[in-house]
A protein has these predicted regions:
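Acidic, low-complexity intrinsically disordered regions
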Residues: 1-188
Length: 188
């Protein structure tokens, strides 16, 4: 039934990174099956609490003791509606403290903002790199500092020198988000 609907066809610009580092842009036609919209609240504290319970219980299983630690990806507009900043920082710290013998849980935040005028950021290295927007900076503070063994991969993705990075992006491109998720979820 959905396929038979008369849906609009959109011209979408795609960005793809080639193995040699060049970026290829192309335009493809895509049907818009469902029109995205935002409505309602963002119960981020409740989502983080559920994530905490899941990683805590998973890490408590003896067979998982030496496994690669869990990775939590939070995709959000950044505006938690069910707690204040201190409450979000507290539950995020609890998530980041749970782990295995291979390391602690990585909490990675993907902040999608309606303000497209700001420069996109992937694996932020400081709060100052982000727009002067409290939700972006809060998500930076609650994101995990990435383990040093990822620094070279992150620096290659960002096109910069290795430094300290956080698992946080702000309005990043689809290509960069996929790169972020690949880096954050691959055991090294």
């Amino acid at each position: 039934e959905l396929y038979e609907r008369d849906t609009p066809r959109l011209q979408i610009q795609r960005e793809r990174k080639l193995p040699d580092g060049r970026t290829l842009f192309s335009v493809v036609e895509q049907r818009e099956w469902i029109t995205p919209f935002a409505q309602g609240q963002t119960p981020m504290h409740a989502a983080f609490l559920k994530a905490y319970e899941l990683v805590r219980d998973w890490c408590a299983i003896r067979a998982h003791g030496a496994c690669y630690p869990p990775v939590v990806f939070n995709i959000t507009d950044g505006e938690a509606s069910d707690c204040d900043e201190a409450g979000l920082e507290e539950i995020a710290a609890r998530i980041r403290q749970v782990g295995t013998s291979d390391g602690n849980t990585l909490l990675m935040n993907i902040h999608i903002s309606s303000d497209l005028s700001k420069v996109p950021v992937v694996f932020a290295s400081s709060e100052e790199e982000l727009p002067d927007q409290r939700y972006a900076r809060l998500l930076y503070r609650v994101s995990s500092e990435m383990p040093p063994l990822y620094n070279e991969s992150i620096a290659a993705l960002r096109g910069c020198q290795p430094e300290i990075f956080r698992g946080m992006s702000y309005n990043a491109s689809m290509t960069d988000l996929i790169g972020m998720m690949n880096i954050g979820s691959v055991s090294v």
